[in-house]
Amino acid sequence: QRATGARVHLMRLSSAAGVALVRAARREGLPLTCDVAAHQIHLTDVDIGFFDSRFRLDPPLRGQRDRDAIVAGLADDTIDAICSDHRPVGDTGKLLPFAEAEAGASGLELLLSLTLKWAQRERVPLARALALVTSAPAAILRAATA
């Protein structure tokens, strides 16, 4: 990116390290945008329980520290958008031992409810929460085509 000046969009941030790298790149003035999947705002590796394959995702669920960093990144505008990460997997792909199960989950129908739940919990204004799933992704796409 430094050599070409190309815009970069990082999809589905899931770790504190990823949020920190975005902050560092922005301090350098690099043209960078990023998003996070709605489920990463709410779930952690603890939710996997005893290797529940329904929670086999890519990127994987991480620890509480990572989830807290993602929430902080949304609060301070480090993270530009919230996405659904909609990658449904049928029973044949999920009803397997955790290590063999396909990564993915149906996310489209949960995007709005999870975003609004986060906004209520964190006292985020409704307009801001809705922008993160509507106008912010649209702006990222427009910038990518400019």
Which ranges hold each PLM region?
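Histidine/acidic residue-rich metal-binding segments in metalloenzymes
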Residues: 1-82
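His/Asp/Glu-enriched, well-ordered alpha-helical/loop segment
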Residues: 2-5, 54, 81, 87-146
